[in-house]
Amino acid sequence: PQNFEQKIGFDSIRHLLKGKCLSTLGEERVDEMAFSEKYEEINERLEQVMEFIRIIQEEDEFPDQYFFDVRPSLKRIRIEGMYLDEQELFDLRRSLETIRDIVRFLTRTTEDEEMEESTSPYPALKRLAGDIIVFPQLITRINNILDKFGKIKDNASSELLRIRRELTSTTGSISRSLNAILRNAQSEGYVDKDVTPTMRDGRLVIPVAPGLKRKIKGIVHDESSTGKTVFIEPAEVVEANNRIRELEGEERREIIRILTDFSITVRPQVPAILQSYEFLAEIDFIRAKAQFAIQTNAIKPSLENKQVLDWRTAIHPLLQLSLAKHNKKVVPLDIELNYKQRILIISGPNAGGKSVCLKTVGLLQYMVQCGMPVPMHERSHIGIFSNIFIDIGDEQSIEDDLSTYSSHPVSYTHLRAHETVLDL
């Protein structure tokens, strides 16, 4: 049926996987996860997850800090005149460093003394990372622009360095002038001893009582909410404060120029960079599947390129998680179906577990063919089916039961019209 995933509970699996993703990159991959009937593809996906389980359990240095999705920003700068702002550039640098570090981690080799050659501890993941482009020159270029906190460096350009030096010099000059004026006003008793210069509307000013504001020549910029203080910009520093405003405008324009120039340089590389982020998305997705497998004690059973079920102690993962909250355990399931024994009839009383059994088979088989490990004994064998059909009604009331029963012949007709020996 069209609501097959809801019938077997796979929609809940997707939801749980999304919760384990580090970014929207991985979440999109969860949405795109699809059933496959190709043995090599399924086997490779399972191997990737099993290798990542080992990474989680055995490695402490896997680089997973910065899974930022900067694809929208990269796509935006394809348009002439658009540029990455400071935060976007910071996210780009950190995520590119993460991609670089992951590729290094997965493509490293160890010496095999018996084979007298170098081998990879994670061959399936190494194959995934093998052709991924990293961008060391781009990272270096960003490092020349941003400091370690993601702020534009003073020396990002010679012009910016000049502007910021003049800003520092002018601000220092204003502070010295204000302090001299303030000390004089304090000695005359116009201003309290504990008063210090403050900032109002981007200008350095002195707080003064309203009744004494004429004692200091200057411009009144603001007053406190209580009306007990006015903020005066002394006439001696007005011109210097104006220069500060001019320099701040120059600084903003120079930063935009730097960011625009960088974006122009990056623009031709955007398609290749986006491809590397697809790799980051895949790693996020595989990691989420590995985390879920660890949580549910899932393994990769012996995968066979034929239609067979030979499962030992198989467990419904959603039921397992639900019961674990109440310190209860699932009753495991053993089942065997093959080309000789192709039909299995399950009978029993109401609430005897028949529906759970059917859903367990459907869900676990679907999970495997979506590249997910499943909770069962490692000696289990699991095959591959072209299609999975299910006709199951959730019993809610007498009326619903009748309508559900009457729908069975329709479902059977559809099944008979489409089934093959390759289906479950």
Model regions and ranges:
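Divalent-cation
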Residues: 178-210, 215-218
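Conserved small/polar residues in nucleotide/adenosyl-binding loops
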Residues: 413-420
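Conserved amphipathic alpha-helical "coupling/scaffold" segments
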Residues: 1-155, 159, 163, 269-272, ...
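P-loop NTPase switch/communication element
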Residues: 366-406
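P-loop NTPase nucleotide-binding module
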Residues: 327-380
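Charged, amphipathic alpha-helical linker segments immediately N-terminal to NTP-binding catalytic cores
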Residues: 292-318
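N-terminal pre-Walker A segment at the start of P-loop NTPase domains
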Residues: 312-331
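Extended, charged alpha-helical coiled-coil/arm scaffolds that mediate oligomerization and mechanical coupling
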Residues: 72, 122-193, 224-285
